UniProtKB/Swiss-Prot annotation:
Main location as per UniProt: mitochondrion
Name of the molecule in the record: Cytochrome c oxidase subunit 1
Protein's organism: Elephas maximus (Indian elephant)
GO BP terms: electron transport coupled proton transport; mitochondrial electron transport, cytochrome c to oxygen
Binding sites annotated in the UniProt record for Na(+): E40, G45, S441
Reaction catalysed by this enzyme: 4 Fe(II)-[cytochrome c] + O2 + 8 H(+)(in) = 4 Fe(III)-[cytochrome c] + 2 H2O + 4 H(+)(out)
Keyword Heme: yes
PROSITE patterns: COX1, COX1_CUB
Residues reported to bind heme a3: H376
Membrane topology designation: Multi-pass membrane protein
Location(s), subcellular: Mitochondrion inner membrane
The encoding gene: MT-CO1
């Protein structure tokens, strides 16, 4: 029965499918917001109205893309679908909690959208800094609704993280050690630990903001002995691990895709890859104040956060060069998924290089809150996380659906998207270096040319998104079924057929120990 299967589901595959569909839908909303932003900035002068509505759109774009697109698809969608299959578990450790994790997201999304409907909306940027987010600058219920939305999304992610950690540690076959797990499983494990440790800090920060707004506390109000910089510390102690949460599952997926389409039986430097992910996870927690170089920290504090941030480049470099070494000498198959993975490696590396630039506190003082920062994090998110999602989706689509995509269309779509995102975000480096600030709906005429180019790129990306929807429709309409996958011996998620049965294992999987 429909309601029993989809509303009360305790099946990891069905919940994963729900996450993928929800993430795709939210992705459309987030894309619409981004198109509105670029339409406003396409030429000087005003298009939508004042800066408040513009900033509401910018804030919503960030929240929707982060909490309702990337995290549900990567962790909820791919994680739920693949983790049990990859470790030979019958399902997740807590199947009903898994269902609740998903169903907390639509109400959360509803609250976020509602926040833009009351008063003037939440025009604070996704960081929600007080005093702008306080009850003077943002009177009314907007920010409160946004805070409740974040609370629900946070609870969802924390429960999900507990579920994944328990599943991965506890539900492997006895003969399978930590170091027999596929890299995607490792990436989700590290991601879940990061979520579990960082989200409670965000919850504390936004709850204090909520009481500051409604109960007359003064956590962030200097008049009552509070400090707005405390909020920044709490927010970024969550916010920096969060950006690694968004990219780590992508690392895992890219490792699988690169290995598969290079015809290799394993990625180069498995242990190095695992330790690199754990190092990135650890270091991600001790660099948060590099987002706050401009609030007036001591020179020695700035020196520490600069050098600690640069250290993250080392494990990241280990991963990039291990991917290249995996490619080396392989029988490379130029499938669309491989193209996405190679695009990921190239563009993520560019984003990493601009990250190294911004790690220097002296440079960041000048570049902070300019479009250089926007360009940097969109290179690692819009071309890192999104490219990984696209590659993973195309690679595992036959597993999820039992049908194959049209590879010609998929390659065309990759090309269109590649041109679109680069035309959108590469010029923003120049805008930032010329001093164009973020979060403004208008700009001096001197910035017109690069902004126009950037906005053209966003419309090309929109065409690519529409092409992807068409490709999925075409696959389900044509019903080209999968007969056999290659390299199944080293890619265990494919072993039970495409798609796998509703209940993968009627009895525990037997894994022979090599030791």
């Amino acid at each position: 029965m429909f309601a029993n299967r989809w509303l009360y589901s305790t099946n990891h595959k069905d919940i994963g499918t729900l996450y993928l569909l929800f993430g795709a839908w939210a992705g459309m909303v987030g894309t619409a917001f981004s198109i509105l932003i670029r339409a406003e900035l396409g030429q000087p002068g005003s298009l939508l109205g004042d800066d408040q509505i513009y900033n509401v759109i910018v804030t919503a774009h960030a929240f929707v893309m982060i909490f309702f697109m990337v995290m549900p698809i990567m962790i909820g969608g791919f994680g739920n679908w693949l983790i049990p299959l990859m470790i030979g578990a019958p399902d997740m450790a807590f199947p009903r909690m898994n269902n609740m994790s998903f169903w907390l997201l639509p109400p959360s999304f509803l609250l976020l959208l509602a926040s833009s409907m009351v008063e003037a909306g939440t025009g604070t940027g996704w960081t929600v800094y007080p005093p702008l987010a306080g009850n003077l600058a943002h009177a009314g219920a907007s920010v409160d609704l946004t805070i409740f939305s974040l609370h629900l999304a946070g609870v969802s992610s924390i429960l999900s993280a507990i579920n994944f950690i328990t599943t991965i540690i506890n539900m492997k076959p006895p003969a399978m050690s930590q170091y027999h797990m596929p890299l995607f499983v490792w990436s989700i494990l590290v991601t879940a630990v990061l979520l579990l440790l960082s989200l409670p800090v965000l919850a504390a920060g936004i709850t204090m903001l909520l009481t500051d707004r409604n109960l007359n506390t003064t956590f962030f109000d200097p008049a009552g002995g509070g400090d707005p910089v405390l909020y920044q510390h709490l927010f970024w102690f969550f916010g920096h691990p969060e950006v690694y949460i968004l990219i780590l599952p992508g690392f895992g997926m890219v490792s699988h895709i690169v290995t598969y389409y290079s015809g290799k039986k394993e990625p180069f430097g498995y242990m190095g890859m695992v330790w690199a992910m754990m190092s990135i996870g650890f270091l991600g927690f001790i660099v948060w104040a590099h987002h706050m170089f401009t609030v007036g920290m001591d020179v020695d504090t700035r020196a520490y956060f600069t050098s600690a941030t640069m250290i993250i480049a080392i494990p990241t470099g280990v991963k990039v060069f291990s991917w290249l070494a995996t490619l080396h000498g392989g029988n490379i198959k130029w499938s669309p998924a491989m193209m996405w993975a190679l695009g990921f490696i190239f563009l993520f590396t560019i984003g990493g290089l601009t990250g190294i630039v911004l790690a220097n506190s002296s440079l960041d003082i000048v570049l902070h809150d300019t479009y250089y920062v926007v360009a940097h994090f969109h290179y690692v998110l819009s071309m890192g996380a999104v490219f990984a999602i696209m590659g993973g989706f195309i690679h595992w689509f036959p597993l999820f659906s039992g049908y194959t995509l049209n590879y010609t269309w998929a390659k065309i779509q990759f090309l269109v998207m590649f041109i679109g995102v680069n035309l959108t975000f590469f010029p923003q480096h120049f805008l930032g270096l010329s001093g164009m600030p973020r979060r403004y709906s208008d700009y001096p005429d001197a910035y017109t040319a690069w902004n126009t180019a950037s906005s053209m790129g966003s419309f090309i990306s929109l065409v690519a998104v529409i092409l992807m929807v068409f490709m999925i429709w075409e696959a389900f309409a044509s019903k080209r079924e999968v007969s056999m996958m290659e390299l199944m011996t080293t890619n265990v998620e494919w072993l039970n057929g495409c798609p796998p049965p509703h209940h993968t294992f009627e009895e525990p999987a037997y894994v022979k120990s090599n030791s």
